[in-house]
Amino acid sequence: LLIIGLFFCSCTPRVIQYRNEKADFANYHSFFILNSKSDHLSAVESDEVNNRIEPFILDEMSRRGYVIDAKTPDVILRFEIIYGSENPKNANQGSFNMIYYPKINNDIAGAVLIELVDNNTKKLIWQSSIDANQTMKKRKEKDPLKKIVIHLFNTYLYQAGNPIPDEQLKIK
């Protein structure tokens, strides 16, 4: 039984989340999306990322009853895709003629972050992030960003204007 439990735990992607206990979720009905902070991406790449992930975020927010308001939103939603090189590995590859040469591998590490900020107080009310590399390796979908966004929003269980978390908002 323990082995089965460990197997299922290792198959689900790890989502790290924060929720502000003092936030008044009953007052949140509208939102506005700020474009991804993308210092590391070119303008073309940034637009492509935004265009791919934004519809999934809009779906999740509208499923919770939130409406878009560009003038006076209750919350500001910001998302970011973070990546960089990690763990350079040196390997000495030999051949039959005893000539050795170094081989350096740089793995690309990435994460997706979504956060909601109260537009009046400017305080963070919710934040969720996921290791995109591990999640994307395990997925067979056409666009794995959808599943990533769903995993992130499975930690935000608030309908618009309702301070009580609703477990039925989780998607499996």
Please place each PLM-identified region on the residue numbering:
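Sec-dependent bacterial lipoprotein signal peptides
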Residues: 1-11
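A structural "domain/chain start" motif
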Residues: 9-64, 72-73, 161-172
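Soluble non-cytosolic domains of exported or imported proteins
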Residues: 44-55, 104-107, 139-147
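Sec/Tat-exported extracytoplasmic proteins
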Residues: 57-65, 81, 85, 120, ...
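Surface-exposed short loop/turn segments
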Residues: 64, 75-125, 131-134
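Glycine/charge-rich catalytic "coupling/switch" loops of P-loop NTPases
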Residues: 69
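A general structural signal for short secondary-structure boundary/capping elements
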Residues: 78-80, 123-124, 157-163, 172
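Short secondary-structure boundary motifs at beta->alpha junctions and helix caps
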Residues: 120-159
